[in-house]
A protein has these predicted regions:
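Canonical positions in the second alpha-helix
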Residues: 1, 32-33, 73-74, 120, ...
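Canonical tetratricopeptide repeat
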Residues: 12-15, 46, 84, 88, ...
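Short coil turns that delineate tetratricopeptide repeat
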Residues: 2-5, 38-39, 72, 76-81, ...
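Short coil/turn linking the two alpha-helices of tandem helical-hairpin repeats
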Residues: 19-21, 48-61, 90, 95-105, ...
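Terminal, low-structured helical/coil segments at or just beyond the last alpha-helical repeat
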Residues: 111, 115, 119-159
Length: 159
């Protein structure tokens, strides 16, 4: 196999394992790929999404820090053109902010998420399910829900 063929084979296997709900096999494959290449974009993407999904399913305590770190590693490995990376990191930051009661700490997380979600919107304006609600919450939390940007999103998407 050439490096390109290996990447294609890895991608196909990931899709097959994911579609077949073979989580253990997928995680094992991703672990092996990251052991070979810690900056492998596709492996990091699967890892970040897997961590975020697990945190979302937690009912007692949701610790978003591992998902945030995974998405930050993915962002480092990206070329900056993938909206889902910016949206995923922005979503995780917003979800963490939603669990914090100290307003200043909460606002800081929304401020960190804001440019990420704006970038996701700019890169993929048609995929509003990935960024619109969270961007609306950021505008409302950082500025005001009466801010023209928040109002525009609310009117456009019906929040």
């Amino acid at each position: 196999y050439t490096a390109k063929n290996s990447a294609v084979a890895f991608s196909v296997l990931c899709k097959l394992y994911n579609a077949a709900n073979m989580t253990a096999e997928l995680n094992n494959l991703v672990d092996r790929q990251l052991a070979k290449n810690p900056k492998d974009f596709l492996a990091l993407a699967y890892r970040a999404q897997d961590i975020a999904d697990k945190v979302s399913r937690e009912t007692e305590t949701q610790n978003w820090d591992p998902a945030i770190e995974a998405y930050k590693a993915l962002l480092e490995a990206s070329d900056g053109s993938q909206a889902f990376v910016f949206a995923g990191l922005g979503q995780c930051l917003c979800k963490k902010a939603g669990l914090i009661e100290v307003r200043a700490e909460q606002r800081a997380l929304f401020q960190e998420a804001l440019p990420l979600l704006e970038k996701a919107r700019d890169l993929d304006p048609d995929n509003n399910t990935a960024w619109a609600y969270f961007l609306y919450v950021c505008y409302g939390s950082v500025f005001s829900y009466n801010d023209s940007r928040a109002i525009e999103i609310k009117e456009k998407f019906g929040f």
